[in-house]
Amino acid sequence: TGSSNLKKFAAYLAVLVLFSCRPLVTTFDDIQDAVTFTSASKTDEPTSVDNLKVMTWNIRFGAARIPWFGDSCGDRVLMTESDVIANMDSIVSFINTELPDILLIQEIDMSSKRSAYMNQVQYILDNTYFNYGAYASMWDAEIIPSAGLGKVNVGNAILSRWQITDAERIQLPLRTDQDDLTQYFYLRRNILKAKIALPITE
């Protein structure tokens, strides 16, 4: 029954809390350092810039057109590794065609079960000409019970040809129309702010 299943899940959560070294859900300070990344193989940084091309893209955690349950357009919850790699390679190909200097990304996954635990920030860095990245999570949970979603870490990222410094995650207000348990497991939206060392002489 539903009541029995709820009790079993509550007991499962209690065991996780007792024996886990980290909380089920990561909470954040109002302002804290973002996570930074570097490409495994850096490319030469442009030493001058006449026109700066900035692109923004919600990559939907590499799901492409997969009918995902969370968008109310299907019933898929988890992708296979081959799904993720194929979709991420398409994203990488588009980036390498458009050649933005700075890329602002929304809904990029880091070690989430639904996207085969891929570090998508590092994957894009290592397969494009971008040298530096900064990441701010908006949803970092060891387990999300909905539909077997499991471990989730998704957020915003900035990728750049040039050095990124002073990257900060700025917490936005949480929703106030949810009960405490729902709010605990829900998104923690944020602003990702950073400085980029553009080759501009004053």
Predicted regions located by residue number:
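Bacterial Sec-dependent N-terminal signal peptides
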Residues: 1-33
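N-terminal, active-site-proximal structural segment of metallo-dependent hydrolase catalytic domains
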Residues: 20-153
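Extracytoplasmic ligand-binding site segments that recognize negatively charged/polar headgroups
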Residues: 148-157, 183-187
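Residue-level detector of beta-strand structural context in well-folded domains
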Residues: 43-45, 157, 192-194
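Internal, well-ordered alpha-helical segments in soluble enzyme and binding-protein domains
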Residues: 120, 155, 188-192
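Conserved beta strand-loop-helix elements of the APE1-like EEP
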Residues: 126-129, 151-167, 196-199
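Active-site catalytic loop in hydrolytic enzyme cores
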Residues: 162-201
